[in-house]
Each structure stands twice: as structure tokens, then as C-alpha cells.
């Protein structure tokens, strides 16, 4: 509850992102707004939730790749927000090579990362036991069961399976979604036509673009 996702999407990513507390895009029919709202920014609730928690005398170490200025800005904003709620946390900016090495060693408390999800929003690689992107080593039978149920759910049960999985992830927080990035092409009004962007490639069909004088 200590992260203001809207300010990160609007300021750190210059409106090129959609804030959400769920690992599912808000435009998806699987998205549950009430669940996302339940994890929305609320510093007071974070303070209450941290009462009696032991976070270590040295505070938390938060890693970010120093080679991406937008991510550094977002990470700093997160640090400022958590610090404002009383969390002792420091930001460590690392080169991509050092950042990846630290993740592989598990030498971190928190880290900011970008992940390209598959179209079905399968999170097995992120939070499944022995998942290839599960750098935190999260291993939980309930999570694995919910992931399996989500993958196996037919059309009628898929929404409820997604809700159960997202509710579990909010309660346990092995990952904390921030936003989904948007791709964009900036051009003068009316100068460019024929754009045909697809997922992960705003320049799809570049050879068919028409630039008007």
C-alpha cells in the first residue's frame, strides 16, 4: 500500500504507462478493478501493516539498473514513498551486468524490473517454484496450485481463477506490480499515416508508413 503507482506512471514514465496493482492489464477481461483498488496507495494502511514487523537493522536494499533513467526515476520515487511511510530503505544503482549478477546471487531485498508477459498473463516464470525469473526464490504450494488452476481454466472459469490468483498475490506480495508500459510514436499531427502497431512493436509495418509533406 506504500507505492503511488499513478504518480510513477504519469511522472517517471511520462504517461507512457498504465498503473495497476495487478499483474493483468486493465484492458483485459480478466482484470478485477476492486482487487486492484484493495492494494491502492495508502501510506496509513502500510504503516499499520508494518507494525511489529522486523525489517532488519540495516534497512532494505532496493536494486535498479542504472542504465535506464526512467526506471531510476521510478525507483527513487518508490524509495521516497516508502521512506515517507517509515520504511528504512536505500536505493542501489547498478550497471546491467552487476544488476543481473546481483539478482542471480539473490543479493537484494527488493529490485525494480521490467517483464514482458505472455498474452495469457501466465506468471509461472515469475512466481512459480523454480521459475526462470523467480529471483527471490518464492516457493509456495498455494501459489503453484493457483497458477495451475489459472492455466487450466476454461473460458467460463478463467476470470474467477484470475481473481483467486491475484488476491493471493496481493496478500503475500512475492511481486508488486507497478504498471504496464505503453509504446508510442511521436509525430506532428496529420503527418504520418499507415501505422499498424502490434504487441511489443510499435514500428510493425514500417515499410507501409506514409509521411505527408
For each feature predicted by the language model, list its residue ranges:
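Extended ligand-binding regions for polar small-molecule ligands
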Residues: 1-10, 141-159
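Periplasmic-binding protein-like
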Residues: 1-28, 166-174, 179
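Structural transition elements
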Residues: 2, 14-52, 68-73
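Solvent-exposed loop/turn segments at secondary-structure junctions
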Residues: 5-8, 15-19, 28-31, 67-70, ...
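Bilobed periplasmic-binding protein-like "clamshell/Venus-flytrap" ligand-binding domains
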Residues: 10, 52-66, 111-114, 153-189
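Short, solvent-exposed loop/beta-turn-alpha elements that line the ligand-binding surface or hinge
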Residues: 29-46, 102-106, 124-151, 180-213
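Ligand/substrate-recognition segments at binding pockets and active sites
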Residues: 51-117
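Small-molecule-sensing regulatory modules
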Residues: 59, 72-77, 84, 124, ...
Amino acid at each position: 500500500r506504500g507505492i503511488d503507482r499513478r504518480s510513477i506512471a504519469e511522472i517517471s514514465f511520462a504517461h507512457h504507462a498504465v498503473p495497476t496493482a495487478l499483474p493483468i492489464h486493465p484492458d483485459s477481461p480478466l482484470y478485477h478493478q476492486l482487487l486492484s483498488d484493495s492494494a491502492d496507495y495508502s501510506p496509513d494502511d502500510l504503516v499499520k501493516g508494518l507494525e511489529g514487523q522486523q525489517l532488519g537493522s540495516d534497512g532494505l536494499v532496493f536494486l535498479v539498473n542504472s542504465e535506464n533513467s526512467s526506471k531510476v526515476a521510478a525507483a527513487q520515487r518508490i524509495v521516497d514513498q516508502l521512506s515517507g511511510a517509515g520504511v528504512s530503505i536505500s536505493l542501489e544503482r547498478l550497471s546491467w551486468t552487476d544488476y543481473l549478477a546481483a539478482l542471480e546471487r539473490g543479493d537484494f531485498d527488493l529490485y525494480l524490473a521490467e517483464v514482458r508477459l505472455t498474452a495469457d498473463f501466465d506468471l509461472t516464470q515469475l512466481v512459480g517454484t523454480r521459475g526462470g525469473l523467480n529471483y527471490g526464490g518464492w516457493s509456495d504450494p498455494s501459489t503453484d496450485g493457483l497458477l495451475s488452476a489459472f492455466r487450466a481454466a476454461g473460458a467460463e472459469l478463467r476470470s474467477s481463477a484470475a481473481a483467486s490468483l491475484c488476491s493471493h498475490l496481493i496478500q503475500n506480495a512475492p511481486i508488486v506490480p507497478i504498471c504496464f508500459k505503453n509504446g508510442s510514436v511521436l509525430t506532428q499531427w496529420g503527418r504520418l499515416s499507415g501505422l499498424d502497431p502490434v504487441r511489443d512493436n510499435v514500428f510493425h509495418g514500417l515499410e507501409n508508413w506514409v509521411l505527408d509533406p
